[in-house]
């Protein structure tokens, strides 16, 4: 099957699309084409007998070519069900992974530590439909939890309408210490979509703002490990649906801010080439369009108001100048 190609849309083309009467039909066909497109990749490490127990779901495997490889330790392999995923601004902006299991929590923190990660985004609740995300951090302020050499201390918790922001201090038994901000979005049900577009949009913009703060702080510290900022670790339950949607929307917002274009289908194809099976549920794909529709409208309105204000100021100054003369 030939590979699908989709062109970028400018803001007016995008808004015309989402306002069309056959929008759902058009996007359904688009999603079907993306799902049918063959993705090249192998899953040899995921399918090894010793690694199968480290996968939360037997059918949610991890590409070999983009997988995170952990440093080997005694009685510990290098495998974790996690993949690097590019963002719009730079490569390997994200590490997309499954919710930690009891037997993988230590590997999760090894991943965070080795990449100097400063932000974790959790797109699921601790408990959903009787499924439990293993408690890999302590949700009591002042509490701590230990996994192997890592001690994770909770120093601050802020509860908001649709998310929880927690500050964690991570140590590895040496004098080194790493501060991590842990964001949990609480309004996205498994296999469903949030009830409110703005809740998710505000959450994504909040995390993007936090990442900008991290980049500024690292610049002040003259951080020199790698060419790019530390990756953001993103997970839900399987690490493909809500996780994929988060990465798609983050990238789409960055693209629109930089170029005033929107490339939702091609962005999803790029993500799926790096993390297997992302956004395979159609309603989640629709919802990404609705979030971007809101963001584009808000941005265009803000720009329009600014232009109107600038024109009004220019006219006012011109009138004053004429009066003075």
Swiss-Prot record:
Record-level GO cellular component terms: host cell cytoplasm
The keyword Aminoacyl-tRNA synthetase is annotated on this UniProt entry: no
Entry's EC annotation: 3.1.3.48
Originating species: Microplitis demolitor bracovirus (isolate Webb)
Record protein name field: Tyrosine phosphatase H2
Keywords on record: Activation of host caspases by virus, Host cytoplasm, Host-virus interaction, Hydrolase, Inhibition of host innate immune response by virus, Modulation of host cell apoptosis by virus, Protein phosphatase, Viral immunoevasion
Pfam families recorded: Y_phosphatase (PF00102)
Active site (catalytic residues): 236
PANTHER family named in the record: LD27988P (PTHR19134:SF534), RECEPTOR-TYPE TYROSINE-PROTEIN PHOSPHATASE (PTHR19134)
Compartments, record wording: Host cytoplasm
Protein origin, superkingdom: Viruses
Reactions the enzyme catalyzes: O-phospho-L-tyrosyl-[protein] + H2O = L-tyrosyl-[protein] + phosphate
Residue ranges crossing the lipid bilayer per the database entry: none
Domain Tyrosine-protein phosphatase positions: 27-295
Role according to the record: Suppresses host immune cell adhesion and phagocytosis. Triggers host mitochondrial membrane depolarization and caspase-dependent apoptosis.
The keyword Hydrolase appears for this protein: yes
Protein family (similarity comment): Belongs to the protein-tyrosine phosphatase family.
A GO molecular-function descriptor: protein tyrosine phosphatase activity
PROSITE patterns noted in UniProt: TYR_PHOSPHATASE_1, TYR_PHOSPHATASE_2, TYR_PHOSPHATASE_PTP
